[in-house]
Structures are given as structure tokens and as C-alpha cells.
């Protein structure tokens, strides 16, 4: 089982330290924070080659959450759209040097929920993904798109629309299934998981109370994870605990791993 943590969950600015913490907490996978590649022109970044070497030495599998802060791959503003693509490609290039094999991105948003705007935004996203998938394929990096909440400013109105969009890529585009997001969405986890399952190669897992994205440790919200343990324990992809609540401690992170592994 490839299971571990989001870089942000471990509350450190050092990737090597995050790798060490991941091992101590019972994980074997770490998801890098792609925005760090862009902050102050990468000022906080460690050399990707040294990250790769340290990860291999510690037997840690690396994935990356591609940039999402101020990024919109569906933007109608050409300059923002182009810079968003450029930012994603820069992060993929860095990630490939660091040894990542899988990367996650967000779909983007619209200023108003209107059928015409949603249609046009999806076209912009499709075009952006064509550039991104072409680059990722050269680097042997798999790209997964994350299911949103399907709220007012999302470019997909529901999970069925999201599913139809993904099918249009003929298997080249995979899905990062976010349990917390699905729990908030109107159709819920069961329907969303069953619909998207053929495309899911990556999972983000965290808890909430069904109203907002709280990123809590497992068991601290209202998701009944017992229903999904068989799926998770037999899953061939990567599982990332995206527990970013400031209230959760490392003991909570460790227990979340143990719950999924069946150790508690």
C-alpha cells in the first residue's frame, strides 16, 4: 500500500524533513507542494536532485500537488490562463527532477455560474490540459484531476459532468478522488466513487462534517470510513492523507494511517 501525507500536513518547510516525518508516522509516500516551486521564484526550494536521492534512500514514493494558489486553468483572461499553464509546467519539470511519478491539479473556476460560461471554461481547461498532458507524458508523469465540491464557482455543475469531461481524454487523464470534497458534494461519496472508480489512481483522504472543507483527521468528522476500507486497502494507486487542520497533531496523523492499514 502506498500511503502517506501531504507536505502541508507535516508543517515544515523542508522536504527532506517531511520525508523523515512521513517514515516515523508509518507512511511511505509524500505529496510535494507544487506552489513552493513558484514562491519567490523558488527561493524556498531544495534542489530536486537531492530530494530524489533522499527519497530513494528512505524508500519514499513521491507525488506532487501541482500549483493551485492564484492558478486558474479555465480563466477567460489570456494572460492569467497562459501564466497558469506555465506555472503548472514549471512545477512538473521540477517534480520530474525530484522523482515524482504522479501529479494532481485543480480544474479551475468561473466568475459566474452560467451554462455558457461553464461551457467556455471547460473548453479553456481542455486546451490547457492538452499542453500539460503532452509535457507530462515526455517526463513520464501521470496527471490526475481532482474532484471539486461542485459548488457555485466550479466549472463542473456535478460529478456526472466531471466524469463526462474526463472520459473525453481517452484514458490519458486520471482522477484524484478527494473523499472530503465528495462528502460535501450533493451526490455524496458512494455515487461519486462508483462513477469515477475506473479513472481513480490517486486518493486524497481527510474528514469533515459535510458542510465545509475542514481537512480533519479520520474520525473527527462525519464520514463513515469503515464503508471504504476495503476499497482503500485493495487500491493499487497512492493514498495521501491531506490533513491540514492546525488543530490536528502528529499523533492524529499516525492514527489515520493506522485506521486505513487496519492496525487499530
Give residue spans per PLM region.
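Histidine-acidic metal/acid-base catalytic patches
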Residues: 1-2, 16-23, 101, 156-177, ...
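Active-site-proximal loop/turn and secondary-structure-junction residues that shape catalytic pockets
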Residues: 9-11, 34-36, 68-70, 107-111, ...
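Active-site acidic/histidine proton-transfer and metal-coordination neighborhood
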Residues: 16-17, 56-57, 74-174
Amino acid at each position: 500500500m502506498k500511503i502517506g501525507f501531504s507536505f502541508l500536513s507535516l508543517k515544515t518547510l523542508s522536504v527532506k524533513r517531511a520525508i523523515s516525518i512521513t517514515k516515523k508516522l508509518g507512511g511511505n509516500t509524500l505529496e510535494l507542494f507544487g506552489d513552493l516551486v513558484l514562491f519567490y521564484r523558488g527561493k524556498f526550494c531544495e534542489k530536486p536532485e537531492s530530494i530524489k536521492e533522499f527519497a530513494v534512500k528512505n524508500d519514499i514514493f513521491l507525488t506532487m500537488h501541482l500549483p493551485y494558489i492564484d492558478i486558474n486553468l479555465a480563466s477567460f483572461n489570456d494572460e492569467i490562463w497562459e501564466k497558469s499553464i506555465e506555472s503548472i509546467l514549471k512545477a512538473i519539470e521540477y517534480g520530474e527532477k525530484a522523482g515524482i511519478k504522479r501529479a494532481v491539479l485543480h480544474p479551475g473556476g468561473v466568475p459566474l455560474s452560467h451554462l455558457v460560461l461553464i461551457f467556455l471554461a471547460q473548453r479553456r481547461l481542455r486546451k490547457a490540459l492538452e499542453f500539460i498532458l503532452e509535457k507530462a507524458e515526455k517526463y513520464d508523469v501521470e496527471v490526475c484531476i481532482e474532484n471539486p465540491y461542485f459548488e457555485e464557482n466550479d466549472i463542473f455543475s456535478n460529478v456526472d459532468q466531471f466524469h463526462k469531461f474526463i472520459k473525453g481524454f481517452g484514458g490519458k487523464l486520471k482522477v484524484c478522488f478527494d473523499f472530503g470534497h465528495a462528502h460535501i458534494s450533493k451526490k455524496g461519496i458512494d455515487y461519486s466513487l462508483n462513477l469515477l472508480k475506473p479513472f481513480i489512481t490517486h486518493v486524497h483522504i481527510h474528514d469533515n462534517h459535510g458542510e465545509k472543507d475542514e481537512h480533519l483527521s479520520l474520525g473527527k468528522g462525519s464520514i463513515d470510513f469503515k464503508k471504504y476500507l476495503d476499497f482503500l486497502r485493495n487500491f493499487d494507486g497512492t493514498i495521501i492523507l491531506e490533513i491540514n487542520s492546525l488543530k490536528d497533531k502528529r499523533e492524529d496523523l499516525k492514527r489515520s494511517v493506522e485506521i486505513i492499514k487496519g492496525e487499530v
